[in-house]
Structures are given as structure tokens and as C-alpha cells.
Amino acid sequence: LAMTMEHKDRPLVRVILTNTGSHPVKQRSVYITALLDSGADITIISEEDWPTDWPVMEAANPQIHGIGGGIPMRKSRDMIEVGVINRDGSLERPLLLFPAVAMVRGSILGRDCLQGLGLRLTNL
């Protein structure tokens, strides 16, 4: 994944999430916008972006801790395929995750996802 941007810009990307579970769901895939965040350990999908019929389960560590304190979270019960959509419409090699789901302002692709995509953040 190669991306160049100005420092003032937020690194937002279009993402396709595909539920790989075997149970029936209304939507197998959804498109969202997510922030690339090298400061986040894990990928967190906003409850607003998460389809209501995609199952979640209690997480072993049920809180996300950050600057603002702790936020309750759950984990996807199914493995989710995460694909970043390039500006030309092509799709990066997708990866499989069990993302966290929480009431956050926007979805975040954390280091687990960035590493899986082979993305390296540098300053030129």
C-alpha cells in the first residue's frame, strides 16, 4: 500500500468489510471510511458502521483504554475480511481479523491491520 499525503490531512481510507461467517446475514459486505491509526493497537469498528445482524461477543478485555479513559467494547464473533480500496478503485490484498466493535466516533484501522496490509508509516 503506497499513500502520500500532507501532514495536515487525516489519513482516511475507504474500506470494504466482508463477514466470512457461515450464518445468514442481510449484508455480506459493507463499505466504510476508516482512519489509519498507528497509535492504536487494534482495529476498532464504530457501532454506527457495524451491521446490526453481524454477531458480536464479549471480549476477554472488555474495555478500550486511551487518552479519554475506558470505553466498553465487544469483539466480532466471525472473522472479518478487511480490504482497503485504493483511489483508483483497486483493492489491496485483504486480511482477516476479529475486530473490536465499540461506540467510537469513527472506525479505526489499528496496527494489527496496518501490519497485515504491509503498510509502513514514515516521514520522508
Curated annotation (Swiss-Prot):
GO-annotated molecular function: aspartic-type endopeptidase activity
Keywords: Aspartyl protease, Hydrolase, Protease
Domain of life of the source: Viruses
Active site, renumbered: D37
Pfam families given in the database record: RVP
Transmembrane segments: none
Disulfide bond annotation, renumbered to this chain: none
GO annotation terms (biological process): proteolysis
EC number per UniProt: 3.4.23.-
Peptidase A2 domain: residues covered: 32-113
Quaternary structure annotation from Swiss-Prot or TrEMBL: The protease is active as a homodimer.
Function per UniProt: Specifically liberates the five major structural proteins from the common gag precursor, as well as reverse transcriptase and integrase from the gag-pol precursor.
Note from the entry: This protein is synthesized as a Gag-Pol polyprotein.
Name this protein carries in UniProt: Proteinase p15
Gene source species: Avian myeloblastosis associated virus (MAV)
